């Protein structure tokens, strides 16, 4: 029979392997940090869109009246290999700081 240590070790290894994301699930947290560089922070901005009734074109609301929230540093440092979309279902941007207001000119979308 298998010893209890062997079973526990096998279960722990299986859980670890399952926790590592497969390639191709989206850009990782570290990739987003590299795009932002040291001077900007990785942020999650709302990506609701407003349709222009005359032209039918979609205009991102976050450019006009949205808000961007910094992704917490503990998520950025611990989860380097996890796809960034697991933490931000909206638009991932590089921002100079937390943006809430009429025009978020200090945020640049890097992933959507």
Curated annotation (Swiss-Prot):
Cell location: Secreted; Secreted, Cell wall
Any one GO CC term of the record: fungal-type cell wall
Name assigned to this protein: Class I hydrophobin MPG1
Keywords: Cell wall, Conidiation, Disulfide bond, Secreted, Signal, Sporulation, Virulence
Disulfide pairings: 36-94, 44-88, 45-68, 95-107
Family that this chain belongs to: Belongs to the fungal hydrophobin family.
Role description: Aerial growth, conidiation, and dispersal of filamentous fungi in the environment rely upon a capability of their secreting small amphipathic proteins called hydrophobins (HPBs) with low sequence identity. Class I can self-assemble into an outermost layer of rodlet bundles on aerial cell surfaces, conferring cellular hydrophobicity that supports fungal growth, development and dispersal; whereas Class II form highly ordered films at water-air interfaces through intermolecular interactions but contribute nothing to the rodlet structure.
GO MF assignments: structural constituent of cell wall
Span of the signal peptide: 1-19
Disruption phenotype annotation: Affects cell durface hydrophobicity and results in an 'easily wettable' phenotype. Reduces the efficiency of appressorium formation.
Induction: Highly expressed very early in plant infection concomitant with appressorium formation and also abundant at the time of symptom development. Also expressed during conidiation and in mycelial cultures starved for nitrogen or carbon. The MAP kinase-encoding gene PMK1 and the wide domain regulators of nitrogen source utilization, NPR1 and NUT1, are required for full expression of MPG1 in response to starvation stress. The CPKA gene, encoding the catalytic subunit of protein kinase A, is required for repression of MPG1 during growth in rich nutrient conditions.
Family matches, as InterPro entries: Hydrophobin, Hydrophobin_CS
Transmembrane segments: none
Oligomeric and partner information: Self-assembles to form functional amyloid fibrils called rodlets. Self-assembly into fibrillar rodlets occurs spontaneously at hydrophobic:hydrophilic interfaces and the rodlets further associate laterally to form amphipathic monolayers.
Coiled coil: none
Main localization (coarse): secreted
Native source species: Pyricularia oryzae (strain 70-15 / ATCC MYA-4617 / FGSC 8958)
Domain of life: Eukaryota
Keyword Disulfide bond: yes
